[in-house]
Amino acid sequence: MAEVFVGPVAQGYASGEVTVLLASPRSFCAGVERAIETVKRVLDVAEGPVYVRKQIVHNTVVVAELRDRGAVFVEDLDEIPDPPPPGAVVVFSAHGVSPAVRAGADERGLQVVDATCPLVAKVHAEAARFAARGDTVVFIGHAGHEETEGTLGVAPRSTLLVQTPADVAALNLPEGTQLSYLTQTTLALDETADVIDALRARFPTLGQPPSEDICYATTNRQRALQSMVGECDVVLVIGSCNSSNSRRLVELAQRSGTPAYLIDGPDDIEPEWLSSVSTIGVTAGASAPPRLVGQVIDALRGYASITVVERSIATETVRFGLPKQVRAQ
């Protein structure tokens, strides 16, 4: 059933009621929930400072809240005192780390709790398996993203990074090279398919992962938005600017011809975006807290009488167990 919120009608809105189409699924995925809960539990039980390497998930609100609870975010392990303070713990982020980072933590005697998303860990295992059998691994991902850096580090001498079909065309490999591909878990489905098609066209014996690498949450959020974007005059995507899956949602809407904006929360909404619209699409990336959706809806009802209609394409029931160090006894 649609929810109707009544507020003052803002100048510039289309006359009459404005419809807000709310994509579902949206907001937190299982890997993000696991990572955040891991940090919270470590903070509850640690006897020393709790360091988190990189942002635990790519969301400014989440990071700020955990920092307020005492988490110390560092970009690299060398920011942690050596020797580490008594009882110190370092948490690896949901995006995963390379074996070299793990080795560095071991060498320094750091107590580690690994919050790597199990679906990212699956990609790492596949990279190791492909490389071990002698394949050159082609990883489809975004340069500089933490997940990409971690995966490339699994088998650095055997792994190549590509982002576009043009990158595939530029590959210069010896005759007879056996290739297998893997993908970052947060990519756009359609763009990734174009790169995979280019790889298969050029390398007919291309190996592939036993199951899809793009995670269920990324897929569901993109398909949910795709199901309604054609009806929207504008789309608001709740997520931080360094969130890969949130940025892919913005790009999906824009490729469909609909103006779309990435916002951290309601304060980022610009009134001119909503001028003369009758239908607003709202979704949230997998690292954006669900409560921000409610805050954005509340902000929108300050502009007009709105009817909120949820468009659901799937029900998510995936849950991941916590790292053994923080499981309830």
Swiss-Prot record:
Annotated positions binding [4Fe-4S] cluster: 29, 117, 215
Record-listed isopentenyl diphosphate binding positions: 58, 95, 145, 243-245, 287
Domain of life of the native organism: Bacteria
GO cellular component, one term: cytosol
Membrane-spanning ranges: none
Binding site for (2E)-4-hydroxy-3-methylbut-2-enyl diphosphate: 58, 95, 145, 185, 243-245, 287
Sorted UniProt keywords: 4Fe-4S, Iron, Iron-sulfur, Isoprene biosynthesis, Metal-binding, Oxidoreductase
Cofactor-binding details, from the entry: Binds 1 [4Fe-4S] cluster per subunit.
Catalytic activity: isopentenyl diphosphate + 2 oxidized [2Fe-2S]-[ferredoxin] + H2O = (2E)-4-hydroxy-3-methylbut-2-enyl diphosphate + 2 reduced [2Fe-2S]-[ferredoxin] + 2 H(+); dimethylallyl diphosphate + 2 oxidized [2Fe-2S]-[ferredoxin] + H2O = (2E)-4-hydroxy-3-methylbut-2-enyl diphosphate + 2 reduced [2Fe-2S]-[ferredoxin] + 2 H(+)
Active site: 147 (proton donor)
Enzyme's top EC category: oxidoreductase
Cofactor: [4Fe-4S] cluster
Pathway assignment: Isoprenoid biosynthesis; dimethylallyl diphosphate biosynthesis; dimethylallyl diphosphate from (2E)-4-hydroxy-3-methylbutenyl diphosphate: step 1/1; Isoprenoid biosynthesis; isopentenyl diphosphate biosynthesis via DXP pathway; isopentenyl diphosphate from 1-deoxy-D-xylulose 5-phosphate: step 6/6
EC number of this enzyme: 1.17.7.4
Pfam families the UniProt entry points to: LYTB
Binding site for dimethylallyl diphosphate: 58, 95, 145, 243-245, 287
Function: Catalyzes the conversion of 1-hydroxy-2-methyl-2-(E)-butenyl 4-diphosphate (HMBPP) into a mixture of isopentenyl diphosphate (IPP) and dimethylallyl diphosphate (DMAPP). Acts in the terminal step of the DOXP/MEP pathway for isoprenoid precursor biosynthesis. Has a reduced activity compared with LytB2. Is unable to functionally complement the loss of lytB2 in M.tuberculosis.
Family: Belongs to the IspH family.
Family annotation (PANTHER family): 4-HYDROXY-3-METHYLBUT-2-ENYL DIPHOSPHATE REDUCTASE
Protein name (Swiss-Prot/TrEMBL): 4-hydroxy-3-methylbut-2-enyl diphosphate reductase 1
Species of origin: Mycobacterium tuberculosis (strain ATCC 25618 / H37Rv)
